[in-house]
Amino acid sequence: MKKALVNTRVSVKLRKSEYRDEWYLYVESYPVFQSGKDTPQRVREYLNRTITTPIWDKSRNARTNAEGKTTYKPKRDLNGIIQCKSQLDQESCIYADKVRNLRQKEYDLSLIH
């Protein structure tokens, strides 16, 4: 029987700060199979970067809570980089995408070898 390929996908995501109106940037990898564990793991790597001016894509709902308040996913450009209003935040998102690209290459190379 042929073993299924493990296509680990790495993506940049946002997590809302509990106390401020800012979002933490992190890189998430899934599925990651680790030794000693039967199920695939979701690996998160926080980048110690925050952004305050993401542009929200009003056509893509993330979730709607019990009160009916809707949250949205961030708007991304053609390369998948999160778009921001301020230049400094945009540079943080570009940095996060570079880290994502590096991690994706690491997972792809580990699959080959």
Which residue ranges define each predicted feature?
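Basic/aromatic DNA-contact patch characteristic of tyrosine site-specific recombinases
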Residues: 1-112
